[in-house]
Amino acid sequence: LNDIVLAMPVFSDGKLIAWTADIAHNSDVGGMAPGSLTGDATEIFQEGIRLPAIKVISQGETIQSVMDIVIVNSRMPDTIYGDVWAQIAAVRIGAKRLQELAKKYGANVFERAMVEFMDFGEKASRRELAKLTNGVFELSEEQDDGSFYNVKITISDDLFTVDLRDNPKQLSSPVNSTKDGVMIAAQMIFKSMTDPYSPCNGGSFRPIELITEPGTVFRIAIGN
């Protein structure tokens, strides 16, 4: 819950052309323990404030009531206030740069360039993926509680499959993950194995297939 994501729509001549976004790990977002991290939590409500998708800036102005909700739930209100504003500044600067590009080259050229940029990322990943040894690779690792986490990775010329279905059921402790959270880990592994040095984009991860089982530690069921 410490990781707060901010996203901002980017418009050019009234047309939505992109989004800028950032994510930051905040020092404390409430919960039962300082730092909002504890191995004793048995449900997500003990880990801090949960923020749904909610508008914090409207027409360029702060919605202070929303900002106050974040601040008053932190043991470090001044710190989180500054960190959230740093995130706001970052997405604003990103949006400004994209608007400058769209103004210089035109929105249509900008949008085509973004599509080609994503396609370029995919081509680069597939080129490097084809260099990896094809096969099925499996690993089981014992955890502190005695259970085993299992992963099966299948590599072909055009697909990198991560199969996590054979794993323990979700637990009443802070060891579970969402499928999206696991996908981030899979993307990091894939990037480090294929093309670790060049910038990446959404297209870079198109060759990844992630398979998880609902209700397990790697795909927790809603409400737990």
Name what the model sees in each region.
Residues 1-3, 21-22, 29-35, 63, ...:
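Short acidic, glycine/serine/threonine-rich loops at helix termini
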Residues 3-13, 21, 154-155:
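A short, hydrophobic, proline-anchored segment that marks a local hinge/packing element in signaling
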Residues 11-98:
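Mobile "lid/hinge" segments at catalytic clefts and subdomain interfaces of large enzymes
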Residues 26-31, 58, 145-149, 160-161, ...:
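Flexible loop/turn segments at secondary-structure boundaries
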Residues 56, 70, 74-84, 88, ...:
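Hydrophobic alpha-helical scaffolding
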Residues 86-90, 94-97, 128, 181, ...:
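Stable alpha-helical structural segments in soluble proteins, enriched in small hydrophobic residues
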Residues 92, 96-169:
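Accessory "access/gating" subregions that flank catalytic or transport cores
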Residues 174, 178, 187-224:
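Hydrophobic core positions in small helical hairpin nucleic-acid-binding modules
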